[in-house]
Amino acid sequence: MSLSSLPGSFSSSSHPLVPYGWDADWEAEFAPYDSEGLLAGRVIRVDRGQCDVVTPGGMLRADTAFVTPHDPMRVVCTGDWVAVEPAGDPRYVRTYLPRRSAFVRSTSSKRSEGQILAANVDYAVVAVSLAVELDLGRVERFLALAWESGAQPVVVLTKADLVPDATTLSYLVQDVETAAPGVPVLSVSSNLGEGLDVLAAVLSGGTSVLLGQSGAGKSTLANALLGEDVMKVHATRDVDGKGRHTTTTRNLLALPGGGVLIDTPGLRGVGLWDAETGVNQVFSEIEALAAECRFHDCAHTAEPGCAVLAALDTGELPERRLDSYRKLLRENQRIVAKTDARLRAEIRRDWKRKGAEGKAAMEAKRGQWG
């Protein structure tokens, strides 16, 4: 049975895939495969050459052998929309639809290949534990990748109930806001249920990926948002707030208030992958200052008329911010030097085109971010 012949095509909000992010644009993209009798579905989980896919008829298991190229940037991942064979043993994923966005980090290989953690994401939720000392540099690193993905970053400060008083919590939020210009910063306590309604409202109607290092409280937060204990939770060490990987695979789950959530394993290593635009977005105040420098190619080291150094001298720009900016730019330049520029440009063009279309669709449904 073709997708368009199912009762309640996309024009009806009762379409089985709407809760997982299906919309008119995805339906149009899928039309050629629909005419071939293939099933539309969204990848819920990928595991060793197979994936779980939610389709109009329910959940099924499919083999990814036909869509497993040598390029790790083009393999099927959680969040992809795919065309699946309607029957067979095994049944195969035949292709995936062009991605609107993708969250990518570099691998530890000498070739510095990119690793896709999640696809077609609207919000990148960076979970930061308040049970340990804030690492603003790590927050900035996550945000650079989030901005580069095409998603809207959101920082969620978890375990707020462990902060001794409201004044201290306010200062911590302000510190993170300074490191995250243009990014909503929310504090929550999954144990007490505080702040969850606000976060759920933000994430409703879109696809969100939940990111953070081990021990950040991601699985506890995911369970609180889902309203049930879906993700396993392990205890963290009091001394450093770290714990074992609770989530070992990337899972996509429908939220009760609307939207879907992709939970990822705790990330100990978060390398940049062609994220210059994202870095510039995180440090937008430095980019604005750089535009005022006397020389267009100013390196902000010792040049006369450097607006960045002037702001550093007056205290307008914290030295920590400038150091972090330089560090991330240097790292990104090393990664870029090792990778195929033509391939990167091709992938980025495709994502930006689809991302613009996806953002327009989201704004039409929900209105722009307030």
From Swiss-Prot:
Please state which protein family the record places this protein in.
Belongs to the TRAFAC class YlqF/YawG GTPase family. RsgA subfamily.
Instruction: Pinpoint the CP-type G domain residues.
Output: 111-270
Origin species: Streptomyces avermitilis (strain ATCC 31267 / DSM 46492 / JCM 5070 / NBRC 14893 / NCIMB 12804 / NRRL 8165 / MA-4680)
**Gene Ontology CC entries for this record:** cytoplasm
Which protein are we looking at? Small ribosomal subunit biogenesis GTPase RsgA
UniProt keyword Iron-sulfur present: no
Subunit structure, briefly?
Answer: Monomer. Associates with 30S ribosomal subunit, binds 16S rRNA.
GO terms (molecular function) for this protein are: GTP binding; GTPase activity; metal ion binding; rRNA binding
PROSITE patterns noted in UniProt: ENGC_GTPASE, G_CP
Q: State the top-level EC class.
A: hydrolase
Q: What InterPro entries does the record tag this protein with?
A: G_CP_dom, P-loop_NTPase, Ribosome_biogen_GTPase_RsgA, RsgA_GTPase_dom
